[in-house]
Amino acid sequence: MSGAVGLVVKRRSGIAEDVARLVVKELVESGVEVLVDETVDYPSLSGFPRFSISRDPPGRVVVVGGDGTLLRTFLRLGERESPLFMTIKAGKKGFLLDVERYEAVERLRDFLEGRFREVVYPRYRVYLEGEARACMFNDTAVTANNAKMARVHVFVDGDLAMNIDGDGVVVSTTAGSTAYSLSGGGPIIDPRLDVIVLTPLNPVQLFLRSIVVPSGSRVTVEASVYSNPLVVNIDGQYVYELEPGGIVDIERCGSGVRIARFRWWEDYYERLYTRLLAYW
């Protein structure tokens, strides 16, 4: 594989900066042109040409940081064709990043030489009152504001699936099943499956449980006209208000995200639970 490699790095993190410097050193020694994303502000990386993930991403991009860094990068990408991402964990948890920092150089060499498995992750376009807002990677939560009750109706391809009086609902992808949905009692979805998970949050209707639907479904969340004002949170990054009677539509986005995986399926659940226990 040839061509420049872009670098996106978590901000205000000494660990992420140290890992990024190792990555840059290896790339330079390998004769690869290094481009640094416009959001990176470390003086040690200031001497390299800049790029923007939202305008002109190179064909390959290394992301160093945690889940938040990765999710922000994907949101900034918009609906552009995805570069091939390599992800290096330099955050506290990093469920979505499979390369540990101690193996960063070795895996970077594998990345440059094509020794990996490319996995394409679907994303879902989120509409607020008919206007496209973003393509989510993890989840979209429609929740109550100011600790008041949320009343929402959830539809799948036009059919009513849930009436919820409670804290709201989380609509998650397979990748997002270990995030907010899991905290709300939703299932862990094997990463080899391609589905959408609908998880009610603390419903008064105690019989309500998560529903798993096909990835091609169109999910609609309608705020009841009797509901309090709600909040729509996309991937924990973009937040919007939703008035009573407002509608959120979610459907598959045309462009997925390409990620180079190295040991993603090996000991997956062991690694998953190890990272979950890190919250203890």
From Swiss-Prot:
- Protein origin, superkingdom: Archaea
Q: Which InterPro entries match?
A: ATP-NAD_kinase_N, ATP-NAD_kinase_PpnK-typ_C, NAD/diacylglycerol_kinase_sf, NADK
Alphabetized, the UniProt keywords read: ATP-binding, Cytoplasm, Kinase, NAD, NADP, Nucleotide-binding, Transferase
Q: Which SUPFAM superfamilies match?
A: NAD kinase/diacylglycerol kinase-like
GO CC terms of this entry: cytoplasm
Which coenzymes or cofactors are required?
a divalent metal cation
Keyword flag Membrane: no
The GO annotation for biological process reads:
NAD metabolic process; NADP biosynthetic process
Q: Where does NAD(+) bind?
A: D67, G68, R72, N138, D139, D167, A175, T178, A179, Y180, S181, L182, S183, Q237
Q: What class of enzyme is it?
A: transferase
Catalytic residues (UniProt): D67 (proton acceptor)
GO MF term set: ATP binding; metal ion binding; NAD+ kinase activity
EC number(s) recorded for this UniProt protein: 2.7.1.23
Can you state which reaction this protein catalyses?
Answer: NAD(+) + ATP = ADP + NADP(+) + H(+)
What this chain does, per the entry, is described as: Involved in the regulation of the intracellular balance of NAD and NADP, and is a key enzyme in the biosynthesis of NADP. Catalyzes specifically the phosphorylation on 2'-hydroxyl of the adenosine moiety of NAD to yield NADP.
Name this polypeptide is given? NAD kinase
Question: Encoded by which gene?
Answer: nadK
